[in-house]
């Protein structure tokens, strides 16, 4: 066990790291916010690929095409790199180019470019601070057709994919290779159907143009690979390109030794005069593999576009990497080498079944060697690859970049291209704010509401403050899986000083009837950062006590707005704890937002009357209404460990068959010492004492016999709980069946009144 002093030092270091990270985030937000006040520079383009891992993928293809076009000669190009000096091939090529420059990710120059560049092109995501400005055009190209489950299709995927979803909602254009990618990934996996207001350009992936070019001029492609350190000669190229593992580019799992072993073992089994096995790893693990591989002549460098290599590859070996979708257009064979397919399919999930993949599956090195030899022996194009290309690569024809540029940069008529803007549905869209996800009665009611909504009628988005805390994470995991989730990172597009000024002003003065320009700008920027272009028919602040969501909702561009009143709000504001009114300032500010809501929703008729009277000076009577909190009956039974059939059997006087294996103990009912001995054979002394004390306390508070049925309710004795109705109803039950009792656990201002009613 750790000593107290060691634990203290560990906690101290964690606090220092947390504080340092917070200060860095504040500095970034401050700089980015400052640059957002500057004009957007016309005819500028910012490119970022894989968080700055190089000049790569679709952004690289778009960049080179634009650079080659006479009608785009006035464009200024800005490339984002993780470390500018770490990419000498790229920077050296454009050192003297007057229209190309490089910025380091996270730097002040990067934040300036992100805030003031007209065209933003990324194949992954911009950071949490980013929010697209109205003058900007954001093109997210993504980086491949999905094979692995993505977004909400992964276990716990909604919170994990929070920044991807946010980026997509901010985008003006998303790039798609084919209908499968559009429907499977954009519409369903990231749940853009219903709220996305941009366009999906389904005209192929720009990066595949490099593949077509490489196939037309293989000598140039092979020469490029040779110049970057690969030893090819005139041998046929076998490319091993496995996927990366992990949940984010920032935290990949790397097993470099295993990857290198596969290449060396396969090369050893083939004729070295005729075949060469080369390795292409994902950009995010490249440095780690280079460190382990040392000076080798078979690792494809990041500086060579992947599709350039694919164009001269004779046989592709991969696992779950979507790289094979690009390769299908070559008509050459694909092999899948996977040692954990069943486990991976269960844990992560795949969109295609094993039998739907486009090549043989090998689970061992001997099997891979055999399949490799068979594929290399064939002189005919791969029928499976050609069939797959018709579905997944029909538009990877060498002109995908031109078509995208025509739509985005040249303003071509979209009717001549496959451009989807049909993301609306007949469902009404609901945005429900859940608050900070801390366990309490309001949280339980919110989760119950999400489970009881009609998802055939409503498209539901649950919005909350993201947290990794154990209690809050548990509640996040209980959000109905049918709801889309948008977790908010706790930051603003403003400096900490500007945030304090805005919040302090609102806390002191509240919201006026007419909202000022500065208020609207501040909160509209935050709305854009979180939700992008999304619009909702109905906005619900179910939390009811915080200031953030009411202030944010005033800047919402559309939708009716409702806020829940979970208690006698005026009394809550005056409630004292240890001599202080902790809620007074906050609720006074919240009350001033009521004039900007359409509905003020109490949770019972009686509470509605109380709030309508107490808050009359803040809103008109027509805004006050009520909606009784819902119950998730299935969850109650599940947590109680019983089924509806068991409940029905007990009500009918039958003894239900639990279907459980229960060990039964026998004892002498007339001898307590003997009975206790038998009991202690099955339970610890502490458990027996705890149960005895609990029953003794219950017997004192609510006497009853062994045959008495006990009902228990737990909650604050306040109007919204409506204990009076429960007591009156239970009186009728007791009149018909005296052998029942009701135990009410709680305290509050209605205690004396309820005691009188009892």
PLM segments and residue spans:
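Conserved catalytic-core segment of nucleotide-activated headgroup transferases in glycan assembly
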Residues: 56-64, 68, 76, 205-289, ...
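Short N-terminal targeting/anchoring amphipathic segment
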Residues: 46-47, 112-126, 508-520, 527-546
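Membrane-proximal helix-turn-helix segments that form the acceptor-binding/catalytic region
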Residues: 109-111, 159-174, 527-534, 569, ...
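A short, active-site helix/loop in glycosyltransferases that binds the activated sugar's phosphate group
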Residues: 173-197, 587, 593-626, 631-680, ...
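N-terminal pre-catalytic "stem/leader" segment of glycosyltransferase-like enzymes
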Residues: 2-113, 423-518, 522
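C-terminal amphipathic helix plus adjacent low-complexity
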Residues: 365-440
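Active-site proximal beta-strand in glycosyltransferases
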Residues: 133-150, 335, 538-540, 553-573, ...
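Catalytic binding pocket for nucleotide-activated donors in carbohydrate/polymer assembly enzymes
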Residues: 163, 288-296, 322-392
């Amino acid at each position: 066990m750790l000593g107290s002093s060691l634990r203290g030092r560990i906690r101290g270091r964690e606090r220092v790291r947390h504080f340092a990270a917070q200060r860095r985030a504040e500095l970034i937000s401050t700089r980015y916010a400052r640059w957002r006040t500057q004009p957007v520079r016309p005819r500028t383009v910012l490119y970022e690929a894989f968080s700055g891992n190089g000049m790569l993928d679709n952004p690289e293809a778009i960049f080179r095409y634009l650079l080659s076009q006479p009608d785009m000669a006035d464009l200024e190009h800005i490339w984002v790199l993780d470390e500018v000096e770490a990419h000498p091939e790229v920077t050296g090529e454009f050192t003297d180019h007057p229209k190309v420059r490089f910025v380091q990710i996270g730097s002040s120059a990067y934040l300036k470019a992100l805030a003031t560049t007209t065209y933003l092109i990324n194949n992954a995501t911009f950071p949490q601070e980013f929010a697209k400005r109205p003058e900007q055009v954001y093109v997210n190209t993504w980086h491949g057709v999905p094979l692995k489950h993505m977004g909400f299709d992964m276990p716990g995927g909604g919170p994990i994919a929070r920044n991807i979803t946010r980026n997509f909602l901010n985008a003006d254009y998303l790039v798609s290779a084919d209908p499968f990618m559009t429907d499977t990934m954009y519409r369903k996996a990231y749940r853009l159907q219903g709220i996305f207001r941009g366009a999906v350009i389904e005209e192929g992936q720009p990066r595949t143009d490099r593949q077509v070019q490489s196939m037309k001029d293989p000598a140039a492609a092979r020469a490029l690979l040779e110049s970057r350190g690969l030893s090819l000669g005139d041998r046929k190229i076998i490319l091993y390109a496995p996927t990366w593992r992990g949940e984010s580019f920032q935290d990949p799992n790397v097993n470099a030794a295993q990857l290198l072993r596969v290449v060396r073992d396969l090369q050893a089994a083939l004729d070295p005069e005729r075949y060469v096995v080369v390795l292409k790893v994902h950009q995010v693990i490249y440095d780690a593999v280079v460190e382990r591989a040392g000076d080798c002549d078979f690792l494809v460098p990041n500086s060579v576009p992947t599709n350039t290599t694919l164009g001269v590859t004779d046989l592709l070996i991969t696992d779950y990497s979507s790289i094979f979708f690009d390769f299908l257009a070559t008509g050459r064979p694909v092999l899948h080498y996977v040692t954990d397919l069943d486990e991976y399919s269960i844990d992560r999930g795949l969109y295609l079944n094993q039998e739907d993949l486009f090549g043989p599956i090998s689970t061992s090195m001997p099997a891979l060697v055999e399949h490799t030899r068979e594929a290399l022996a064939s002189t005919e194009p791969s029928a499976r690859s050609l069939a797959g290309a018709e579905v997944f690569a029909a538009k990877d024809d060498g002109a995908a970049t031109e078509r995208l540029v025509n739509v985005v940069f040249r303003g071509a008529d979209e009717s001549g291209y496959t451009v989807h803007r049909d993301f609306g549905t007949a469902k009404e869209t609901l945005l429900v704010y859940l608050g900070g996800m801390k366990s309490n009665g309001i949280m339980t009611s919110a989760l119950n509401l999400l489970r009881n909504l009609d998802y055939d009628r409503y498209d539901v988005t649950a919005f909350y403050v993201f947290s990794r805390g154990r209690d809050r994470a548990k509640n996040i995991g209980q959000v109905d899986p049918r709801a889309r989730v948008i977790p908010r990172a706790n930051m603003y597009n403003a400096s900490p000083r500007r945030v304090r000024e805005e919040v302090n002003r609102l806390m002191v003065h509240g919201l006026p009837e007419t909202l000022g320009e500065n208020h609207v700008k501040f909160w509209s920027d935050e709305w854009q950062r979180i939700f992008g272009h999304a619009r909702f028919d109905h906005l619900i602040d179910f939390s009811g006590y915080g200031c953030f969501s009411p202030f944010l909702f005033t800047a919402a561009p559309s939708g009716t707005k409702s806020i829940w009143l979970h208690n006698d709000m005026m009394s809550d504001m005056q409630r004292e704890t240890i001599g202080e009114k902790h809620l007074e300032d906050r609720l006074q500010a919240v009350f001033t937002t009521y004039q900007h809501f359409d509905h003020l929703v109490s949770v019972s008729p009686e509470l509605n009357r109380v709030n309508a009277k107490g808050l009359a000076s803040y809103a008109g009577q027509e805004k006050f209404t009520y909606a009784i909190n819902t119950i998730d009956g299935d969850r109650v039974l599940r947590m109680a460990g019983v089924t509806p059939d068991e409940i029905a059997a007990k009500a009918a006087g039958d003894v239900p068959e639990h279907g459980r294996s229960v060990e039964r103990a026998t004892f002498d009912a007339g001898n307590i010492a003997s009975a206790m001995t038998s009991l202690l054979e099955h339970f610890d002394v502490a458990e027996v004492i705890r149960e005895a004390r609990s029953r003794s306390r219950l017997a004192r508070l609510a006497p009853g016999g062994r045959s008495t049925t006990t009902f228990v309710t737990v909650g604050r004795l306040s109007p919204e709980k409506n204990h009076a109705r429960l007591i009156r109803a239970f009186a009728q039950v007791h009149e018909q069946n005296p052998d029942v009792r009701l135990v009410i656990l709680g305290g509050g201002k209605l205690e004396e009144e309820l005691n009188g009613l009892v």
